[in-house]
Amino acid sequence: MENVELLIEALPYIKDFHSTTMVIKIGGHAMVNDRILEDTIKDIVLLYFVGIKPVVVHGGGPEISEKMEKFGLKPKFVEGLRVTDKETMEVVEMVLDGKVNSKIVTTFIRNGGKAVGLSGKDGLLIVARKKEMRMKKGEEEVIIDLGFVGETEFVNPEIIRILLDNGFIPVVSPVATDLAGNTYNLNADVVAGDIAAALKAKKLIMLTDVPGILENPDDKSTLISRIRLSELENMRSKGVIRGGMIPKVDAVIKALKSGVERAHIIDGSRPHSILIELFTKEGIGTMVEP
């Protein structure tokens, strides 16, 4: 009976979400744990079969760092963004497109999902430009050169719409090009937010390795289960948001301001976290609303 009650609880959410598009960002932590990846993909396949149109964007940070170290390259980050020289860019593209994307697509196929892997280059899905980062150093503002780190100039969502309309699950790696053919490494959180905005998605779901937005970043028990966009912006400006959570929060803020209805930041390592967040009243992570 308990299982039946859970299904009944999910019914209004399933009706509300039917035929809507959701962009789901899978973090690099899932790539190094086959059980987490398998469980995550099963959840997304279930979303597909109840009539939701999922779009998956993936990172691959841990695997990139591991491969870099094998080549004698030392990973370096600035505010959660990987500094990417030419050698690093070659490793990034090899790992994200050649290994991680293929692994996710294969996992979908094994679990009954019709997935298609693509990068931001394919069909000019994402046209990128070099990212210019400005930081305060004392009283001065300095420009930090991140190398081949890019940002989205614009998104052409047509190829994703074609795939969704024909029953496929797009799986996107955050490698993109500018119109001159230069290849860039884009932050996967940012790419997920930009694609969600271009599609006017119902939801943007960020899977990470922390419970969600924390009132105190050093205390996992301080989870904020529901927060307004204005409150999140205030936390960001006060420096409460730190490290790898910065690009996630920035992507969420931009997406909601661009028409995405809701965003969720949840712990993707917890079993069935997507289903619990979407189909139960309590949820499991943080929901951000306008």
Swiss-Prot record:
Q: Which GO terms describe its molecular function?
A: acetylglutamate kinase activity; ATP binding
Residues at which substrate binds: G60, G61, R82, N185
Pfam families, per database record = AA_kinase (PF00696)
Give the record's GO biological process terms.
arginine biosynthetic process via ornithine; L-arginine biosynthetic process
Q: Which InterPro entries match?
A: AceGlu_kinase-like_sf (IPR036393), AcgluKinase_fam (IPR004662), ArgB (IPR037528), Asp/Glu/Uridylate_kinase (IPR001048), NAGK-C (IPR041727)
Q: Where in the cell is it found?
A: Cytoplasm
- UniProt pathway annotation: Amino-acid biosynthesis; L-arginine biosynthesis; N(2)-acetyl-L-ornithine from L-glutamate: step 2/4
EC no. given is 2.7.2.8
Indicate the annotated site residue(s) for Transition state stabilizer.
K25, K248
Q: Name one GO cellular component term.
A: cytoplasm
Protein family (similarity comment): Belongs to the acetylglutamate kinase family. ArgB subfamily.
Q: What PANTHER family does its record include?
A: N-ACETYLGLUTAMATE SYNTHASE, N-ACETYLGLUTAMATE SYNTHASE, MITOCHONDRIAL
Q: What does this protein do?
A: Catalyzes the ATP-dependent phosphorylation of N-acetyl-L-glutamate.
Instruction: Specify the protein name.
Output: Acetylglutamate kinase
Species per Swiss-Prot/TrEMBL record: Archaeoglobus fulgidus (strain ATCC 49558 / DSM 4304 / JCM 9628 / NBRC 100126 / VC-16)
Question: Which taxonomic lineage is given here?
Answer: Archaea, Methanobacteriati, Methanobacteriota, Archaeoglobi, Archaeoglobales
Question: What gene name is given for the protein in this entry?
Answer: argB
